[in-house]
Amino acid sequence: MTIAVAMSGGTDSLFALVLLKEQGQQVCGLHARFIPPTGHDPVPDIRAMCDRLGVDLHVVDLTEAFEEHVVRPFMEDYMVGRTPNPCARCNATMKFGLLADAAAHVGAVHLATGHYARLLRHPRWGTVLQRGVDPAKDQSYFLSLVPHARLEKAVFPLGNWRKEAVRGELARRSIVPPLPSESQEICFVPDDDYRAFLKDRRVRLPGPGPIVTTRGRKIGSHAGLWQYTEGQRKGLGIAWHEPLYVVGKDMENNMLLVGGREALASPGCVAEEVNLLVPYEDWPAEVAVRIRYRQQPLSARVTLRDGRLYARFREPQPPAARGQVLAVYDMEHHVLGGGVILGPLP
C-alpha cells in the first residue's frame, strides 16, 4: 500500500516523508506545480532530496486548475467586498481534490501532507478530523472545508508533533529541506502584498466612497471597500475622539461602516458552502467555533437550516469577516464541520 506524500520542499512535508519511511511505509513523493515558477525552480532540489532518501518523485502540473479554483475566486471575492481564505479553498479543491486524484493515478492509496492536524477513527463517524497538538501550528481550521470522503484517504503524520521538535529531528538526521524557510501566507501573492497582486492582475475593484458611522454621520472617505476587513482598526486614516473599527460594508451604496468598540459586538454569523464532517444530528448543543485563524475557540450554539450554519456566540464578538471560514468543534477538539461566512446573524 503506497502513500504519496505531497512535497512542497519545506520542512513539514519533508519530515512527514521521513517519518512514514522510517515507520516502514511504502512511500513516494508528489509535487504539485500550482503556480508557474517565477524564480528558482524547487523541483530539482526536491528530486535530489527524494533520490537521497530512496523515494520516487512524481511532478504534476496543476497551474490551470489552481488559477480556476483558487486564484480566480480569490480575486472575485475582493471584487464584491469579501475577505477570502484561499488556503481553505485550496485544501478542499486542490490538495485533497485534484492532487489526491493524482496520487491515485500513480498508484497511491493515501495522500499524506505536512499539516498539523490529527485524524482519528470513530465507531460511528469513521475518520474524524481533530486539532493538532501544537496550538501555535494547528491547521484544522484550514481543513474544515475538505469533504469527509477525501479525509478518509488522508494521512497527517505531524498531528502529534510540535514545530520545534520537527526542526530538531531533521537537524539530528542532518537533513536540510530544499526550502527551509516558512512559506508565505498566500503562496501565489508575492511578498503577501494582495493589494499589489490585485492591481497587477488588473482586477476591477470598487473605488473610493464615504466612511459613515453607525449613527449615519459621514466622517471621511475610504480607498475602496476591498481594502478593509470587518473588525479592522488600523489604516482607516481618520482622527477621531475614540478608536474606530470597521463594523460592516454597505456594498450597494459603497459605504464603509465604522463605530466604537461597543459597535463591534456581534451576536453571531451565518455560513454557506457547508461541509459536514460529523452528522449534524450528532452535534452537541454547545459547541466551539473559530471565525478566524489563530483564534481561541468561542462557545456557541450552531444550527443547520436550509443548507446554512447559524452560529450564535455565547458572548458577543467582533464581526466575522465575510469570506472567511467558520469552523465548528466539539469539546474534544473534533472538527464537526465548516462553512464560508456569509455575514452576521439576521
From Swiss-Prot:
Its EC number is 2.8.1.13. Keywords: ATP-binding, Cytoplasm, Disulfide bond, Nucleotide-binding, RNA-binding, Transferase, tRNA processing, tRNA-binding. It is an enzyme of class 2 (transferase). It holds the Pfam family tRNA_Me_trans. One of its GO terms (molecular function) is tRNA-uridine 2-sulfurtransferase activity. The keyword Disulfide bond applies. NCBIfam families: PRK00143.1, trmU. Catalyzes the 2-thiolation of uridine at the wobble position (U34) of tRNA, leading to the formation of s(2)U34. Belongs to the MnmA/TRMU family. This is tRNA-specific 2-thiouridylase MnmA.
